[in-house]
Amino acid sequence: MVSRVQLPPEIQLAQRLAGNEQVTRDRAVRKLRKYIVARTQRAAGGFTHDELLKVWKGLFYCMWMQDKPLLQEELGRTISQLVHAFQTTEAQHLFLQAFWQTMNREWTGIDRLRLDKFYMLMRMVLNESLKVLKMQGWEERQIEELLELLMTEILHPSSQAPNGVKSHFIEIFLEELTKVGAEELTADQNLKFIDPFCRIAARTKDSLVLNNITRGIFETIVEQAPLAIEDLLNELDTQDEEVASDSDESSEGGERGDALSQKRSEKPPAGSICRAEPEAGEEQAGDDRDSGGPVLQFDYEAVANRLFEMASRQSTPSQNRKRLYKVIRKLQDLAGGIFPEDEIPEKACRRLLEGRRQKKTKKQKRLLRLQQERGKGEKEPPSPGMERKRSRRRGVGADPEARAEAGEQPGTAERALLRDQPRGRGQRGARQRRRTPRPLTSARAKAANVQEPEKKKKRRE
């Protein structure tokens, strides 16, 4: 009897993760989490790169098989939170590296119906990766290691990442960083997060990557500048209010008794309805909830200097330098207190219409100039067909000068025109030959029972 080969646990879990039944897949995800915790707790334990690639193969098809939107979101959150089950930073980075390599490998096989849920999975994994840094206190070394991993697997020229993965990663990076660390990160730390993008934008020869980084990173920073400054001013006002409240607490200690007794006396009687008005602090809190959340803070002058340092190198391509210099000017204006002016839709529409009118006027002037150069105001000679139609309308003998210029005799032109014209009644301008009746003999006149022409003449006389 042949003994059955025992498969490694990673392969068994991958097979169950890619199963047809949802119950089997959910159970496999729970077992995988327990297996990761148990294996990484041991000193000699851990996963190899190949083992994690097999695990991610099963997780990829586990997400592939999930077809309900709410369940897709729940499964994506569960899969992305597996990074917290690893007990060491090296194992976490290896897990993230295997994820991005799996996405790069399988991206071209994803159809458009399943594309959105994998976009969501990428966003959730990036969010949990940044939460790992937050739990570690935003250590500089951990930040550098994670950014190096992401740049190597996604944006580096030697990476095998498709354009869809690159574009989506650049688009969501600042959004997820804002969600996780906008309340804690300083301007210097934020500069470290965007520093790899500065290097890639200055070195890359891919115009798509350059355009995505410029629009998704640098121009987003410029657009969010008013919100960032407003957020900073609100934070400073809050700190001033806290300091003022701490200083007033000591002076208000003796007056609390009188205030409490006065409030008791001003209470409405029982059974009456009193509509409370919101206080100023509550209104401010409501406005803060209605407005957007915190925004990343940047030192615009430091960002401009860093970009200028990378763009001014001799190895930087000319098109990259030209594009980055435009962004540098905007950042320098922000550092000097000049904000970019947003065009009002009415003004933009008016400017567009004026541009169209100017183009139309230029086109008309160009056509008029060409006509003047061609004939200096003279009319172009008509075509032979048009000349024939005109001659039919006015008759051949009406224009003897044109007939003389053509070198034809009057009789010849008339005969040629009559030969070309169709025979029929109602032809305008056609010359018909008059028929002269032949004189009837007496015998023929009697047979036809008509009088002779001579007798008719006598009667008419």
Curated annotation (Swiss-Prot):
Tissue-specificity statement: Ubiquitously expressed in fetal and adult tissues.
Protein name as it appears in the record: Ribosomal RNA processing protein 1 homolog A
Superkingdom of source: Eukaryota
Residues the record lists as N5-methylglutamine modifications: Q427
Purpose: Plays a critical role in the generation of 28S rRNA.
Homology family: Belongs to the RRP1 family.
The species this protein was found in: Homo sapiens (Human)
Post-translational modification summary for this protein: Methylated at Gln-427 by N6AMT1.
Bias type Basic residues, positions: 357-368, 425-437
